Amino acid sequence: MNGCMYLCGMRKLSMQELNRLSSEDFRGAAKQPIIIILDHIRSMHNVGSVFRTADAFLIESIYLCGYTPQPPHRDIHKTALGATETVAWEYFPNTEAAVAAAKQKGFSVWAVEQTNQSIALQNLPPATTGRALIFGNEVEGVRDSVLSLCDGSIEKIGRAHV
């Protein structure tokens, strides 16, 4: 496989060839109408990973709720690799307030959780409005008080233990 890389002429692009936006230009760029809501996430590394993913996919913003760690923090920055400077985020003392804020902006709100009414991710109908996706605590998941406020729930169907 590595031989093909050289024989086929495949190579990684240089930073200059990637033509990446500056942090300022990135903040002003058009975003996907998606809000990620983190409901009492414990791990700073998980929070940093969400920032980095949101940066990669041009996600509109992240809402950090409850005891979810917030930037600036060394362990978040270690995983986020600069994304805390480019991705818009807000802190809400409780997730219910974050859900209300997303709905006020016209977003539908979906829990990423296994419930008796979950829709498999691949069966989710196309969005007609922005979507807010709630990810719950690593152990407890999305809390019942938050589930009751959601427009639905989606789950990834698979055999992997996550």
Annotate the PLM regions.
Residues M1-R159:
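Post-transcriptional modification and biogenesis factors for structured RNAs
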